[in-house]
């Protein structure tokens, strides 16, 4: 009725349930526990620029102070990996800002999402506190961080991915030198 223990060198039975490596037997929760253990030990890196280093990119600082929805839209598109466009995110930010004045609550979730994606530390205080107290500085810091990670913020997610794909295709593979005399 029950299968015998797997012999040494024999293939395990295909059950559709991932094995966790415990001698060929499925251990309940083993795969999930391992996945969560890896996530919990993610390295925490410092931000590449400080919160108050807005003048490192004067153009972005001016744009953000005059119309923060533009900077938010650009960063949100990259953080969402292209699932929402810059225009959509920026318009939603502007709508929340005009209707409620609580755009900081909306934007702090994107800061938290960005920190999770790139393993950034909570600094100098919680995401919501940073966005509620220093909205423009927080948006500028997120923009600079993505820019320093190689994103061209003016072209969006899909164009950045296309550009990275072309750059990878243009680099020839490394060839090991052959036999020499």
Swiss-Prot record:
TM region positions: 88-110
Q: Which GO terms describe its biological process?
A: negative regulation of cell population proliferation
- UniProt lineage: Eukaryota, Viridiplantae, Streptophyta, Embryophyta, Tracheophyta
Family stated for the protein in its record: Belongs to the cornifelin family.
Q: Which InterPro entries match?
A: PLAC_motif_containing
The question of whether Repeat is a record keyword is answered with no
Q: What does this protein do?
A: May act as a negative regulator of cell number.
Keywords (alphabetical) are: Membrane, Transmembrane, Transmembrane helix
Q: Which gene encodes it?
A: CNR2
Q: Among the entry's GO cellular component annotations, what is one? A: membrane
Q: What's the protein name?
A: Cell number regulator 2
PANTHER family according to UniProt? DUF614 FAMILY PROTEIN-RELATED (PTHR15907)
Q: Where in the cell is it found?
A: Membrane
The membrane topology of this protein is:
Single-pass membrane protein
Q: What is this protein's tissue specificity according to the annotation? A: Expressed in leaves, stalks and tassel spikelets. Detected in roots, apical meristems and immature ears, but not in pollen. In leaves, not detected in the cell division zone, expressed at low levels in the cell expansion and transition zones and at high levels in the mature or fully grown tissue.
The superkingdom listed in its UniProt entry is Eukaryota
Query: What is a single Pfam family found in this protein's UniProt entry?
Result: PLAC8
The answer on whether this UniProt entry bears the keyword Nucleotide-binding reads no
